[in-house]
Amino acid sequence: LTGDYVYKIKKAVDLEFLDYTSLSKRKFYCQQETLLNRRLSHDIYIGVVAISINDGCYFLDGPGEVVEYAVKMRQLPEQCAMVRLLRRGKMDRETTEQLAQTLAEFYGRAATGQGINSYGAWETIRANCEENFRQTDRFAGNILDERMFQVIRAATRSFLHRRKVLFEQRVNAGKIRDCHGDLRSGHIYFT
């Protein structure tokens, strides 16, 4: 955070569904994030910058060896975040309806098709849920109550098995879209 810009760096981790372990992969995913998020925020996502080191000093798009990449975005005022507006009771009906209309149009024109359908397939969703439980299992009994973890896992598995036909119907009806994977009130700003 600089006041004018935000520089978002990806951690060198492997989340199985996203592998950021190499510099080239982090660059690729920075480029992907910029490309995908410009669909809704074209004036916010500026591009990808190289972070380099030269004589012990770090530079943005400067001289030296590239050691990292970052997504460069225009910094927005925190008081304009939807999550803050909601907490203060400042989200009015008109703003909510405008947001709903914008999102409906975005979802309506978002890409769909055979390659995208696989992401909404029951087996893919089930595998992703199981992967999440494997990755978070070590927190059960520590950060998250062990019993609650078991309840969440059982409820998720039960839902998936009860709704398998629904997942198949959604794929067959072309309802799976290339949209935003992390759209939530903390990521929506009204400026």
Give names to the regions the model predicted:
Residues 1-180, 185-191:
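Conserved ATP-binding subdomain of kinase catalytic cores across diverse folds
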